[in-house]
Amino acid sequence: MAIDPNSIGAVTEPMLFEWTDRDTLLYAIGVGAGTGDLAFTTENSHGIDQQVLPTYAVICCPAFGAAAKVGTFNPAALLHGSQGIRLHAPLPAAGKLSVVTEVADIQDKGEGKNAIVVLRGRGCDPESGSLVAETLTTLVLRGQGGFGGARGERPAAPEFPDRHPDARIDMPTREDQALIYRLSGDRNPLHSDPWFATQLAGFPKPILHGLCTYGVAGRALVAELGGGVAANITSIAARFTKPVFPGETLSTVIWRTEPGRAVFRTEVAGSDGAEARVVLDDGAVEYVAG
């Protein structure tokens, strides 16, 4: 069985995701937070309450469960195309969510071309039933088109102002950043095993998880737009465009567009005078304006 275009709207049974403060602390370190970010990396510092980065929603409210509903495809053809989160309440340092995932859309770009699968996750408080977090994950299945689905349309990209950005936030990553991030759940050897990365994937060395890059950008947005308060960031969406290698410095470039809204890109500086490499594009963020 190939990809089933009739699986749009299919949902999974609720799954309970539970986490501790250790998990949220480890995640923060996994996306590069450190001694200058004690609100995210410690739970017992004097006068500092622990906060949880908004991008932790990709861990505690994952949308990937619904991928099992779309039929069969070659997993080696899968790329993570884009990621969005929306928070309706701040994520607690330790907690639990009842998560239901759904096949939101499937697009068939034609025989021998790509298939696009959009998955949605909704995480609710298991006691009150109130919606806490939503995630939207786009998967690109290379060469898996031609299964009789609708071609569909790519969502409109946000418009970027034709002016200098309002902020540029540089955040370095560690050489072992992927080894830390993988402890939050994604053990794909592409990010840790040099043999796998070079011999099977064609990279010169293991690459950083796309969602780690997304989390580093989230830290920059919390710092610049949220004033260091995680709860002030309510939505982040971006498209993955290029790989990142551990040890590279990520620069998140931000334009405020209207009260409570901004657009952003994240890039890696080019070497030997080359142009910067955009690794996250079409970024859009909503926040509580001060």
Curated annotation (Swiss-Prot):
Enzyme's top EC category: lyase
Reaction equations catalysed: a (3R)-3-hydroxyacyl-CoA = a (2E)-enoyl-CoA + H2O; (3R)-hydroxyhexanoyl-CoA = (2E)-hexenoyl-CoA + H2O; (2E)-octenoyl-CoA + H2O = (3R)-hydroxyoctanoyl-CoA; (3R)-3-hydroxydecanoyl-CoA = (2E)-decenoyl-CoA + H2O
Keyword Transmembrane set for record: no
Organism field: Mycobacterium tuberculosis (strain ATCC 25618 / H37Rv)
Role according to the record: Shows trans-enoyl-CoA hydratase/3-hydroxyacyl-CoA dehydratase activity. In vitro, can hydrate various enoyl-CoA such as (2E)-hexenoyl-CoA, (2E)-octenoyl-CoA, (2E)-decenoyl-CoA, (2E)-dodecenoyl-CoA and (2E)-hexadecenoyl-CoA. May contribute to the persistence of the tuberculosis infection by inducing COX-2 expression in macrophages through MAPK-NF-kappaB signaling pathway.
Pfam families, A to Z: MaoC_dehydratas (PF01575), MFE-2_hydrat-2_N (PF22622)
Keyword terms: Fatty acid metabolism, Lipid metabolism, Lyase
Gene encoding the protein: htdY
Residue ranges of domain MaoC-like in the record: 161-271
Signal peptide extent: none
Compositional bias ranges of the Basic and acidic residues kind: 151-169
UniProt name for this protein: 3-hydroxyacyl-thioester dehydratase Y
Xref: PANTHER family: PEROXISOMAL MULTIFUNCTIONAL ENZYME TYPE 2, PEROXISOMAL MULTIFUNCTIONAL ENZYME TYPE 2-RELATED
Gene Ontology biological process terms, A to Z: fatty acid beta-oxidation
Similarity comment: family membership: Belongs to the enoyl-CoA hydratase/isomerase family.
Gene Ontology molecular function: any one: 17-beta-hydroxysteroid dehydrogenase (NAD+) activity
InterPro entries linked to this entry: HotDog_dom_sf, MaoC-like_dom, MFE-2_N
Segments of this protein annotated with the region Disordered: 147-169
Enzyme Commission number(s): 4.2.1.-, 4.2.1.119
